[in-house]
Amino acid sequence: STWSQVATDIMVSKYFRKAGVPQVDEGGKALKDENGDVVLGPETSSRQVFDRLSETWRHWGEETGYFATKKDAQAFEDELKYMLATQMAAPNSPQWFNTGLNYKYGLEGPAQGFWYVDPKSGKLTEGKDSYSRPQPHACFIQSIDDDLVNEGGIMDLWVKEARLFKFGSGTGTNFSNLR
């Protein structure tokens, strides 16, 4: 009841996942079709979005040893849900769009050329799909070489920008190297 109509419209139109989400009944039991397959559809409530984000952030924290106890992890998750629901905090758009789609719903997509630092090995690793290690950052400053077709050049910049734009990020570029 504290959300304005504009905030509600943005949440529903921009941040609710539109497809691939397991549908559940009022008791939380998965709905199945006549073949026994889980029915997939959109997110239908803000609570689903808040759960998707906060449970994933908690999972990542537990996975990397961030919390001293399970109680600390639960408090973190509960406080995040409260802050999101009351609009005390809000992540950037790529977080709303991408975070938790794999962890919460098991969604995968084709690898898109994203890389991440593996928390266990500390090594740069290419992502195996689009959502298990999503690209959650909002803004990137890129450089460009004075070259049309080779790596680091003008056409390569287009590819890098497309990868970032696809998942909701934005970019700026330092063009000072161009003639």
List PLM regions with ranges.
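Extended catalytic cores of very large enzyme megasubunits
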Residues: 1-179
